[in-house]
Structures are given as structure tokens and as C-alpha cells.
Amino acid sequence: MSIRPLHDRVIVKRKEVETKSAGGIVLTGSAAAKSTRGEIIAVGKGRILENGTVQPLDVKVGDIVIFNDGYGVKSEKIDNEEVLIMSESDILAIVEA
């Protein structure tokens, strides 16, 4: 897959998580809530500040992040794979191992 986000945008591949009900039944597909964790697969060059300089992003390719799956997040299918395009400001945290 070859995609290059612009400015402060990032491309995230959602990480699917196994979800169990209170009774121990594994929920999959539409019965399970979508994960708000993902892996950064591409990053833009950075945010353009008012003075014209570019501020690099805090996230990098390979980071596992927790994101806000809200209004500004765009879902797109590229090479038969679903990815999310979002601004860095939609990322809430970087998961550190």
C-alpha cells in the first residue's frame, strides 16, 4: 500500500480486539464494539504553524495509539484494506510497551 498523508494527518490501521460478553461468549463482527486502538502506518510532514514553520508530529510509523473515533476520522479502503485517516489531534495517547 502506498499512501502519503498531508500536513498533520496520519494513516492508522485499526487493531481488532477480541471482546467477551459478561457470560464469556466471544463477540465478533458487528456484535463487538470497534477498537479505538491502531497502528500508525504513515504520517504527514507536520503541522504548519502560523509563522509558516512546520512542527513535526509526535507520532511515528509503527506506534500503537488510542484515538478518538469521531467526526474528523475518515474511513477509507485502500488495496482492499480498511484504514483510517485522521489528524494527529484525534490521537489521545501512544501505547508504550
Swiss-Prot record:
Q: Which Pfam families match?
A: Cpn10
Q: Which GO terms fall under biological process for this protein? A: chaperone cofactor-dependent protein refolding
Indicate where this protein resides in the cell: Cytoplasm
Give the principal location in a single coarse category.
Answer: cytoplasm
For this protein, the record's SMART domains field holds: Cpn10
Tell me which UniProt keywords the record has, alphabetically. Chaperone, Cytoplasm
Domain of life, source organism: Bacteria
* Record Gene3D superfamilies: GroES chaperonin
- InterPro entries, alphabetized: Chaperonin_GroES, Chaperonin_GroES_sf, Chaprnonin_Cpn10_CS, GroES-like_sf
Any one cellular-component term (Gene Ontology): cytoplasm
Question: Which is one GO molecular function term here?
Answer: ATP binding
HAMAP family named among the record's database cross-references = CH10 (MF_00580)
Please explain the role this protein plays, according to its UniProt record. Together with the chaperonin GroEL, plays an essential role in assisting protein folding. The GroEL-GroES system forms a nano-cage that allows encapsulation of the non-native substrate proteins and provides a physical environment optimized to promote and accelerate protein folding. GroES binds to the apical surface of the GroEL ring, thereby capping the opening of the GroEL channel.
Note the subunit structure: Heptamer of 7 subunits arranged in a ring. Interacts with the chaperonin GroEL.
Q: Which family does it belong to?
A: Belongs to the GroES chaperonin family.
Which named protein is this? Co-chaperonin GroES
- Species this protein is from: Klebsiella pneumoniae (strain 342)
- Please spell out the taxonomic lineage of the organism that makes this protein: Bacteria, Pseudomonadati, Pseudomonadota, Gammaproteobacteria, Enterobacterales
